[in-house]
Structure formats: structure tokens, C-alpha cells
């Protein structure tokens, strides 16, 4: 299954409700419990400068893009065993598509 086309506004609401307590998206945004996500697309796992990643995250070696984020966001601990991201995931494909659409627009 491909990544469903997402709605940026719905994705923003999901980000605010489920992600913003640990992540920022703006250029120059600070790291919180999780890394700043600016420049996420096209970056390899564990590469945000100044953030202390687990070895598992650094070693995963995939590049963040629509399809890898779609799989990761369903169940982060299954996709990267040993990640410190304490998020159960988004089980609904349309919600993951919405969040990815928002992240693509907000992290450029």
C-alpha cells in the first residue's frame, strides 16, 4: 500500500495533539525530548545535529521520506527497536498520511 495523500491542516492538528510536546519543526527550533524535525525529509535516521540519539536510531541507516515515515509512524518501536521515542504510533493510514503531508510542508 502506498502513502495516502494527506491533508496538511488535519496533519497539523495531529502534530499539535500527538507530537509537539516532544518535537519542534521550525528552522532553528530547539530539541525537546525528541529532535527538531526541520529538514527531516532526505535526512538519515539519527542525524539531527546536537541531539543525543540511541545507537539503534543511528544504526538504522534509512533515509526519511514518505514511505519510511509511513511505516515508522505506525509503530516506531517495531521499526527501530531501541528507539527512545515513547509513542505508540498512528494505526490509521489516513492519519499517517495527514501527518506526513503536514511534516513535508512544515519542515522544509
UniProtKB/Swiss-Prot annotation:
InterPro entries assigned: Cyt_c-like_dom (IPR009056), Cyt_c-like_dom_sf (IPR036909), Cyt_c_1A/1B (IPR002327)
Binding locations of heme c: 19, 22-23, 85
Ranges in a coiled coil: none
UniProt subcellular location: Mitochondrion intermembrane space
One Gene Ontology cellular component annotation held by this UniProt entry: mitochondrial intermembrane space
PANTHER family: CYTOCHROME C
Keywords: Electron transport, Heme, Iron, Metal-binding, Mitochondrion, Respiratory chain, Transport
Gene Ontology MF terms in the entry: electron transfer activity; heme binding; metal ion binding
Modification note: Binds 1 heme c group covalently per subunit.
Lineage: Eukaryota, Metazoa, Ecdysozoa, Arthropoda, Hexapoda
Organism in which the protein naturally occurs: Haematobia irritans
Name this protein carries in UniProt: Cytochrome c
Family affiliation: Belongs to the cytochrome c family.
Protein purpose: Electron carrier protein. The oxidized form of the cytochrome c heme group can accept an electron from the heme group of the cytochrome c1 subunit of cytochrome reductase. Cytochrome c then transfers this electron to the cytochrome oxidase complex, the final protein carrier in the mitochondrial electron-transport chain.
Amino acid at each position: 500500500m502506498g502513502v495516502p495523500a494527506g491533508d496538511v491542516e488535519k496533519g497539523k492538528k495531529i502534530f499539535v495533539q500527538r507530537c509537539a510536546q516532544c518535537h519542534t519543526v521550525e528552522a532553528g527550533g530547539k530539541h525537546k525530548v525528541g529532535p527538531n524535525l526541520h529538514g527531516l525529509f532526505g535526512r538519515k535516521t539519527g542525524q539531527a545535529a546536537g541531539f543525543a540519539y540511541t545507537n539503534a536510531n543511528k544504526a538504522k541507516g534509512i533515509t526519511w521520506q514518505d514511505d519510511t515515515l509511513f511505516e515508522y509512524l505506525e509503530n516506531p518501536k517495531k521499526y527501530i527497536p531501541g528507539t527512545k521515542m515513547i509513542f505508540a504510533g498512528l494505526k490509521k493510514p489516513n492519519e499517517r498520511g495527514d501527518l506526513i503531508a503536514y511534516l513535508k510542508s512544515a519542515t522544509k
